[in-house]
């Protein structure tokens, strides 16, 4: 009833998620929830709804995605998301290794957000995603393709594709021989990968 005047899409109703279209912009609205057990680095099949906002926000992937809004208290930001948003930083909530091992797709989501928003990836988060990039082998090609397409269309794509090339080599190993491999041509100043 809160969004009765808006177009709503049941995008994940069994997980408590609906998409509300406001002024042409789709916004995901989610009920407070706790995740079940992560199995094989995949999101839990079951969630438990909760009234504990802090517990819900603490299981989110990145600080910029771990904020909430309340009419009574306005923005609820327990993990520094507003500061990271202002400073254009992608940072995991809590331990990056834990976040990426809970859901491998978060590795590509970090790169995609950094590319789309032209943000930097915080150092511990960057080190962890490079260390854990082999987890990407667990993700379906369709899910990888969806994230990769959004990544390459971002404002910061060139920087992300260059700085995090080893992550891409996990999903597109054909690119690795091009990296740091010159054209042997005086008219090309870039290596084959960068070109």
Residue map of PLM features:
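Catalytic cores of the polymerase beta-like nucleotidyltransferase superfamily
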Residues: 1-195
């Amino acid at each position: 009833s809160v969004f009765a005047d808006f177009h709503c899409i049941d995008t994940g109703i069994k997980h408590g998620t609906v998409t509300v279209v406001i002024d042409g912009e789709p916004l995901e609205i989610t009920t407070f929830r706790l995740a079940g057990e992560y199995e094989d680095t995949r999101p839990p099949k079951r969630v438990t709804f909760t009234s504990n906002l802090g517990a819900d926000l603490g299981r989110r992937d990145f600080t910029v995605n771990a904020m909430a809004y309340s009419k009574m208290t306005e923005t609820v930001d327990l993990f520094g998301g507003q500061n990271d948003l202002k400073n254009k930083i992608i940072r995991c909530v809590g331990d990056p290794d834990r976040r990426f091992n809970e859901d491998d797709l978060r590795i590509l989501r970090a790169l995609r957000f950094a590319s789309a928003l032209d943000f930097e990836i915080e150092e511990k988060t960057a080190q962890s995603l490079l260390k854990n990039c082999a987890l990407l082998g667990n993700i379906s090609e369709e899910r990888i393709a969806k994230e990769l397409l959004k990544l390459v269309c971002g404002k910061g794509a060139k920087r992300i594709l260059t700085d995090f090339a080893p992550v891409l080599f996990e999903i597109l190993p054909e690119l690795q021989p091009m990296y740091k491999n010159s054209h042997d041509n005086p008219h090309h100043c870039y290596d084959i990968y960068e070109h």
